[in-house]
Amino acid sequence: MKFCPKCGNLMLPDRKRKVWVCRSCGYEEPFDEEKDREKTVIKQEVKHKPDEGIVVIEQDLKTLPTTKITCPKCGNDTAYWWEMQTRAGDEPSTIFYKCTKCGHTWRSYE
């Protein structure tokens, strides 16, 4: 991150013109590809459709907390759990469970 020496606000890179630009006061400073590369991060937003479902990519579930709940598939009484906001912000979050024995995943709307 780079801050404007005039007003102290965050400066953003304009890669086409190869300058740092302050959107508050208009100050510009040359962009040095070698020196400034590690100060910039390209952010890419991934949008999901509501019907796509939730996929757990990280398989190291041993770091997740566990709770006593019966798995509807195998009857095991322990599951990993995590909470996510899957609906509108003014609605309660969704709790997901994954059985420690068979790996079945289900959800609970709180």
Swiss-Prot record:
One of its GO terms (biological process) is DNA-templated transcription. CDD domains: Zn-ribbon_TFS (cd10511). Pfam families: Zn_ribbon_RPB9, Zn_ribbon_TFIIS. A zinc finger (C4-type) spans 4-25. Zn(2+) 2 binds at residues 71, 74, 99, 102. SUPFAM superfamilies: Zinc beta-ribbon. Belongs to the archaeal RpoM/eukaryotic RPA12/RPB9/RPC11 RNA polymerase family. Induces RNA cleavage activity in the RNA polymerase. In its presence, the cleavage activity of the RNA polymerase truncates the RNA back to position +15 in a stepwise manner by releasing mainly dinucleotides from the 3'-end of the nascent RNA. The truncated RNAs are able to continue elongation. Involved in transcriptional proofreading and fidelity. Misincorporation of nucleotides during elongation of transcription leads to arrested elongation complexes which are rescued by TFS-promoted removal of a dinucleotide from the 3'-end. This is Transcription factor S. It comes from the Archaea. Zn(2+) 1 binds at residues 4, 7, 22, 25. Keywords: DNA-binding, DNA-directed RNA polymerase, Metal-binding, Transcription, Transcription regulation, Zinc, Zinc-finger. GO terms for molecular function: DNA binding; DNA-directed RNA polymerase activity; zinc ion binding. GO terms for cellular component: DNA-directed RNA polymerase complex. It comes from Thermococcus celer.
